[in-house]
Swiss-Prot record:
Gene Ontology MF, one: methyltransferase activity
A Pfam family recorded for this sequence: Methyltransf_31
InterPro entries per UniProt: Methyltranfer_dom, SAM-dependent_MTases_sf
Organism: Methanocaldococcus jannaschii (strain ATCC 43067 / DSM 2661 / JAL-1 / JCM 10045 / NBRC 100440) (Methanococcus jannaschii)
Protein name: Uncharacterized protein MJ0906
Superkingdom, natural source: Archaea
Length: 366
């Protein structure tokens, strides 16, 4: 155990004692350290996964409220309340250049039943109720919430054009900005969950799809010097940052490639594939999964983590996530476990699949 015995001595003082506020805080720290040291690794892993899931569930509520607020701010709900228009009349009533964005908003609101069709006209659904579950605030990673606050803010530029420079710049940030985002607690926790579950160790061969700038050093530290790490990313800038971090520490044992993963030549040599927040950008899910399965040997595992897997949590409002993520032209969509299983079966693979929380799937090739 790592707790400081000097702290205990300072508090108890070797006899009877009274605990003041400061002493109580010190004892709380000691108790937390002891509990953390003796807590089984499975429980620690479960708590980390719960942190991720709670963050996304809270974010779903926040995005839904923001979506409704935008309906008022953009003048969409007032127009519908006043005119009860047909869908074809919408482009004539809105004042913004990007009519498609307004139509996309209305279609999403219809799916959410915030709006409704009645006699071929669109109307406000006055029976819509917004039920929000009070989140566990001590289990929310606030930095990831801030990321979406930024995305929803730039959505107003889509009223002009989906290709507005403000939107394009937001999703093509300077690599240094993305490097800072990838170092945040949310993404750091995602890396920890992957390494804890897979029990990554020296000698392992890892393929990291969409590795970014932070994952390479994190995973190479674990497998060096006997193992091998291959990091693939479409951002040359992020790979350059990663290279600067690792080239002086490791003379070999790794490769970083600035290519689209679907264009690599698969080799059945990897023990593990890490695919974190990347699958939603795959142009073809079938091709993407086939490439990953072709890159691991029998017994190898693919660790897929996304914000959520469809149908895992009824409290997740996928429609609002999809609406705002469409601002990124590379976004393709979220998938269910069934989507993945059906594709793998159609490709003829033998596999086992395990679900961890609401956003992680682990596929083992048999």
């Amino acid at each position: 155990m790592k707790f400081d015995s000097a702290k205990i001595e300072n508090v108890v003082g070797g006899g009877s004692f009274e605990i003041g506020d400061d002493d109580s805080k010190i004892l709380d720290e000691i108790i937390s350290e002891v509990i953390n040291d003796i807590m089984p690794s499975e429980i620690k892993l479960k708590k980390k996964i719960e942190m991720i899931d709670n963050t996304i569930e809270y974010l779903s509520y926040e995005l839904l409220v923001t979506f409704i607020k935008h309906g008022v701010e953009f003048g969409i709900f007032p127009i519908i309340a006043k005119y009860s228009p047909k869908i074809d009349d919408i482009p004539l009533l809105v004042k913004y250049p990007n009519k498609q964005f307004i139509l996309d908003y209305i279609k999403t609101a219809l799916k959410l039943e915030i709006l409704k069709y009645e006699d071929e006209k669109i109307k406000i659904n006055e029976d819509f109720e917004l039920n929000i579950k009070m989140p566990k605030f001590d289990k929310i990673i606030s930095d990831y919430v801030m990321k979406y606050n930024f995305i929803t803010h730039v959505s107003r530029y889509a009223l002009i054009s989906y290709s507005h420079p403000k939107i394009a710049i937001s999703f093509k940030k300077d690599p240094d900005i993305w490097d800072m985002i990838l170092s945040s607690p949310y993404y750091s926790l995602c890396r920890e969950i992957a390494s804890d579950y897979l029990k990554i160790d020296k000698g392992d061969y890892i393929l990291d799809v969409g590795c970014g700038s932070r994952s390479p050093k994190y995973f190479i530290d674990m497998i060096y010097p006997e193992g091998h790490y291959m990091g693939v990313d479409i951002s040359k800038g992020l790979l350059q940052i990663a290279e600067c971090r690792i080239k002086r520490l490791y003379c070999d044992s790794y490769e970083l490639k600035n290519i689209d993963f679907t264009k690599i030549i698969p080799k059945e040599k990897y023990d593990y594939i890490i695919c974190s927040h990347t699958m939603i950008y795959a142009p073809s899910l079938k091709q993407f999964l086939n490439k990953m399965m072709s890159s691991i040997h029998s017994g190898g595992k693919i660790f897929i983590s996304e914000e959520f897997i469809l149908d895992k949590n009824e409290n997740i409002c996928k429609e609002v996530f999809e609406f705002y993520n469409r601002l990124n032209k590379r976004f393709r969509g979220y998938y269910s476990e069934k989507d993945i299983v059906d594709i793998l079966e159609s490709l003829g693979y033998d596999f086992k699949i395990e679900s961890l929380g609401n956003g992680i799937l682990v596929i083992e090739k048999i």
